[in-house]
Regions:
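Rhodanese-like catalytic fold shared by cysteine-dependent sulfurtransferases
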Residues: 20-55, 82-112, 123-209, 235-266, ...
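Short, compositionally biased "basic patch" segments
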Residues: 22-32, 68-81, 223-234
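Extended, small/polar residue-biased N-terminal targeting/export presequences
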Residues: 53-59, 65, 78
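Short, surface-exposed ligand- or partner-binding patches at beta-edge/loop junctions that are enriched
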Residues: 116, 270
């Protein structure tokens, strides 16, 4: 009888222990997905998503040509660089920038590292990637070489237009509800490791792959998720049909409207000049969104309206007569 009682006591203790273990297994949570891990790693480190774009004017670069704390990197083609470039500029292909920063220079030796291109847009995109990589002293030169001298200004002179001003709308388009984010599959667990994989991937892709033409957007606005990143008063003046306002400085944060962006549709993003947008395209593409920059921004389709309202419109006034090395 005593043996029987002992058996039942042992049985119930075993069942209770097993039950407790099962309960512990059931509450064990899965690790966060790569998107969440990367986003948590980046937010707070990337200042330009709050509207603080590191864009500097050409005259600041000109004034600091003899300043060894300023390092100029020209990412234009070899032929354009040979035709004329800023004194002491290094000609580095865009796809080699990350390696250049990691192995060829000590970025901390410089107060400012300035990226220069044709229009300021591709330089802004790669400056964005480098800022995301942790290099907080990198800047892009506003308007690119178009603002340095007239024979480099065709990029902007040929692309500032008013073609679609009559097709703008003023209706306020509502954002969708928050959805699920893109899925990243780098195979890494830590935010820094995931970021490194994303940067390696994106530096290998030419910036041209992210350029969208405003004419194509106006012809088929339904084919894109159109984001006008700016201020309410500017949005109300007129925007691309179907465009939704994402407020400058706040709308692309995790706790606001970031997750209203679609994971399965092309995001066509634009700002006033396309240079600010290029920074945002870099950030969103790192996170896995399929994002393109409407080239030259609002200057490509409403340049006169920008001028009338005192906004950031390109004109010959932005072109200087600064010296180059030929």
């Amino acid at each position: 009888m005593k043996k029987l009682k002992f058996f039942w006591i042992l049985f119930f203790v075993s069942v209770a222990t097993f039950g407790n273990n099962v309960g512990k297994l059931e509450v064990k949570s899965d690790p966060p997905d790569e998107f969440t891990t990367l986003l948590e790693f980046l937010e707070g480190k990337v200042d330009f998503i709050k509207g603080n774009f590191p864009i500097i004017p050409a005259d600041e670069v000109k004034k600091n040509l003899k300043n060894e704390a300023y390092h100029i990197i020209d990412i234009r083609s070899d032929s354009w660089f040979e035709y004329g470039h800023i004194k002491n500029a290094a000609n580095i292909p865009a796809e080699e920038l990350l390696n250049y920063f990691r192995t060829k220079i000590n970025p901390a030796d410089f107060e400012k590292i300035i990226l220069v291109c044709y229009s300021g847009q591709s330089a802004a995109y790669y400056t964005g990637l480098l800022r995301i990589a942790g290099y907080d002293n990198v800047y892009s030169m506003k308007w690119g070489m178009s603002s340095w001298r007239e024979d480099f200004a065709d990029s902007w002179l040929k692309n500032t237009k008013t073609s679609f001003e009559e097709k703008l709308e003023t209706v306020q388009n509502s954002k969708p509800a928050s959805g699920t984010p893109p899925q990243l599959n780098t195979g890494k667990l830590a935010g820094e490791e995931i970021l490194n994989e994303r940067l390696q991937t994106l530096f290998a892709v030419p910036y041209n792959d992210f350029i969208l033409n405003s004419e194509d957007i106006f012809k088929n606005p339904e084919g894109y998720f159109i984001v006008n990143y700016g201020k309410t008063e500017d949005y109300d003046l007129g925007h691309i049909p179907g465009a939704m306002l994402y407020t400058e400085g706040s709308s692309l944060l995790r706790n606001t409207d970031l997750l209203t962006l679609p994971k399965d549709k092309k995001v066509a993003l634009y700002t006033t000049t396309g240079q600010e947008a290029a920074y945002l395209v870099a950030y969103l593409n790192v996170l896995g969104y399929d994002t393109g920059n409407i080239a030259y921004g609002e200057n490509a389709f409403m340049n006169d309206l920008l001028k009338k309202n005192g906004r950031d419109a390109f004109s010959p006034k932005q072109i200087n007569l600064f010296p180059v090395i030929e």
